[in-house]
């Protein structure tokens, strides 16, 4: 099956046209091929694999080698989709580490690397990677690699000062070269404000319906996450009959603005 190549420029065009798009995590060739065949434009090899595939309680144990291995697999299944890959915990704490590890992940097949957080040191890394032809996606709000700082997986940006800081960080990430921005577990109104403030596409997870795109961990989208699912998750497999139909439903509901609904969002 021949599929149109999806690029960062594609997502920028969609933002300008107010066209919503879906994204999903993927970890192997079988699922990435299935997702691509249903029209999924963007996939993420996330460090969430530490929890979903490896059984850890956080994303912190995931290594660059883990990400590279799964990126190669996902790329084989979805050669024409836009593929993001996380730089995992402590893999970009120095410029030398960021450069080496980003190169490893890009060689494995990623189109863009994602790093978490804001602040001057992050902005410098984003700028230096971008200058060396490595596209970077930022990630603000609930950044799972900072779980021990946050004291758990908690909503971010509810206080006025925290919201202002997130807006400033989003603007700075764009200024220093970030191509995309993931917004996780922040109030819907704040995500809307950030999306309107910056020109790069935003991708939300638990950030309401006003971001340019939406992303879900595949296990959440298919209702196979252990324990209680997060508030923002929806089981698209329920009532669908098969995984292909479930993924088609997810894509359709995002594109039509039906998902996320109010019950999946934080106010």
Swiss-Prot record:
Keyword Transferase listed: yes
Keyword rRNA-binding: no
Single GO MF descriptor: 3-methyl-2-oxobutanoate hydroxymethyltransferase activity
Gene3D superfamilies: Phosphoenolpyruvate-binding domains
Species of the source: Schizosaccharomyces pombe (strain 972 / ATCC 24843) (Fission yeast)
GO biological process terms held by the UniProt record: pantothenate biosynthetic process
Similarity field: Belongs to the PanB family.
InterPro entries cross-referenced by the UniProt entry: Pantoate_hydroxy_MeTrfase (IPR003700), Pyrv/PenolPyrv_kinase-like_dom (IPR015813), Pyrv_kinase-like_dom_sf (IPR040442)
Keyword line: Pantothenate biosynthesis, Transferase
Pathway: Cofactor biosynthesis; (R)-pantothenate biosynthesis; (R)-pantoate from 3-methyl-2-oxobutanoate: step 1/2
Gene Ontology CC annotations of this record: cytoplasm; mitochondrion
Pfam family, one: Pantoate_transf
Identification of the protein by name: Probable 3-methyl-2-oxobutanoate hydroxymethyltransferase
Catalysis: reaction(s): 3-methyl-2-oxobutanoate + (6R)-5,10-methylene-5,6,7,8-tetrahydrofolate + H2O = 2-dehydropantoate + (6S)-5,6,7,8-tetrahydrofolate
EC number: 2.1.2.11
